[in-house]
Each structure stands twice: as structure tokens, then as C-alpha cells.
Amino acid sequence: MALTMLLLLVAAALTLIETRAGQHSLQYFHTAVSRPGLGEPWFISVGYVDDTQFVRFDSDAENPRMEPRARWMEQEGPEYWERETQIAKGHEQSFRGSLRTAQSYYNQSKGGSHTLQWMYGCDMGSDGRLLRGYLQFAYEGRDYIALNEDLKTWTAVDMAAQITRRKWEQAGIAEKDQAYLEGTCMQSLRRYLQLGKETLLRTDPPKAHVTHHPRSYGAVTLRCWALGFYPADITLTWQLNGEELTQDMELVETRPAGDGTFQKWASVVVPLGKEQNYTCHVNHEGLPEPLTLRWGRWEPPPYTVSNMATIAVVVDLGAVAIIGAVVAFVMNRR
């Protein structure tokens, strides 16, 4: 179960909402997992500003407290950490009841392991105003209920979620969430951007190169790498004689590199001997202009092709250790 959870947490963490140039986001991800016979459910909470994890709470820690995960958060005083710790512990307590409620909605036994997930946050536009707010809930890794874009109504995916929707409509939960997303969330985001401006407002351009991988039947794979960039928003495309190969291109999700930067690659399969007809195009806000690369016309970094695969695995495992967990949802908020 532990390995399954780690894979779940990394998969969700790697799908963080990316913001465009000039935009910023504050997001919180909570996860609660029941574990029969092993004590109380595991609860973990992480917060992100843009692509940077800045706070974390783990109920399995020796002394569970909200802790800084970015150096610039060490500027906050004891009152802040005590307040955030109490908030996290309040979520932990409510999720225990929520797990039991969810099991009853789906007529599940108490013997298995079950997962509640909740994600919420706000995006700031380049003008400093709220661009969008969002709040999503899931059970057993599947969508359950979500706040709509108007921040006033809910979308429930099944009959159990309809029960929750009716309860929340009667309790005016959407109005409270809207007030938080438009007010406190945006105020907090502005504060964190000020605290971490040297890190959060920087731009690190990608280091890019193309690798060559022979295949059978007279074909080769060209893989375009972008490494060491920040923020995470980047565009990689392959073109054949100036025309984009969107459908024929394999593109991986942007991955954290474990050092505060990101990596990504895109590949295409091409006929042997025709490699020079294909160009990779890299666009990132840290670049003065987009890069155009061909196989054999860019100085690769000191990594072998085999090492790159190893690096990708290590990066994902590092992301597990650093990120810890993703999303959480609440069925009943008390």
C-alpha cells in the first residue's frame, strides 16, 4: 500500500496547475488515508506557491507541526507556525469523520484502506487580481465534487456526491469558499510572493539538447531535452520542414528536478538519414528568444543517454520525498 500511495502522490503532484508568465498561484493539497490495524488515518498537507512547495504537515512525524519547506518561509514567526499547525490538526480531525462518512455513502467495509483528497487554491493574473479560484474533492482517487468557476455552485459526479452537494448548499459552504478564495487566499499569495521574491520571481532559462536513439526497421527516435528551468511553464514542439508534429510527438509532463528547477522532454520517431529535416523548438520566459535545435547541432551537457533515464527515475523518487502528498477532500465540514 505504501508504494501505491507514493505513486499516487507523485502522479498528482506532477499535475500541478502551471501558471503562464506574469501569473502566480497559491495551492494547498491534502490527503487522508485510512489504514486499518495501524492506528489513526495518515494525514498530510502541503502548500505550493507557483511551483515551489513552501509548507508541509505530516501526522506521522514525531512532533506533527506545520513546517517550512522553503528557506524564505523561515522569516515567519512562532505565532504563524502555531496558527497553521492548529489549522492542520483541525483538518486532520475532521477527515477522520469524513472517511467514515464516505465509507457509509458507498456501503464499504471498515476493513480496507480508503483515501480522501482535497485541493484548492487561487491564481493571480498579471494585473494582481484574482484570475481564477478552484476547489476540488475526490474519493479513492476519483473525482467526487468540485466548485464551479462561478465559485457559487457545485458539480457532483455521482449519487453519493449529490448528498454532499445538498448538505453544502444548505450550509452555504460555497459562499464561505468564495470569500476565502477571493480574499484570504489572494492576500496570502501576495504576502508569500513578497517573502520569497528572490526565489519565486526569478527565471532560469532551460539548457536544451537533442539525443539520438536508434530503433529497428530504419528508424530513430529524436528526443529534445530541456533541463534546469524555472518556472515550470515551458513549450516543447517538434517540426518537420516547418510544420508542427503534434499528433506524432511524445511529450512527458514537466518534472521537478529536486533542486528547485524542472525538466521536460519531447520525442519523435523519424526515418534514418532524415534527422536534419526535424527541428525542436523550445519556448520559455527565461529565454530572450525561442531556441531551435537539430540533432548534432547543439552541444549536449555531460550526461550520457543512459544516464538521462536514470536521472528521470531519481528525479521522480526525489519528488516523492520532497512533495509527500497531494490533494484531499472533506465530505462534512464541521
Curated annotation (Swiss-Prot):
Segments on the Extracellular side according to the record's topology features: 22-310
Glycosylation sites: N107, N277
Leader sequence residues: 1-21
InterPro entries: Ig-like_dom, Ig-like_dom_sf, Ig-like_fold, Ig/MHC_CS, Ig_C1-set, MHC_class-I_related, MHC_I-like_Ag-recog, MHC_I-like_Ag-recog_sf
GO biological process, one term: cellular response to type II interferon
Segments for region (Alpha-1): 22-111
Disulphide bridges: C122-C185, C224-C280
Record keyword 4Fe-4S present: no
Topology of the protein relative to the lipid bilayer: Single-pass type I membrane protein
Primary location class: membrane
Cell compartments where the protein resides: Membrane
Subunit structure of this chain's protein: Heterodimer of an alpha chain and a beta chain (beta-2-microglobulin).
Family listed: Belongs to the MHC class I family.
Biological role: Involved in the presentation of foreign antigens to the immune system.
Name the UniProt record assigns to this protein: H-2 class I histocompatibility antigen, Q7 alpha chain
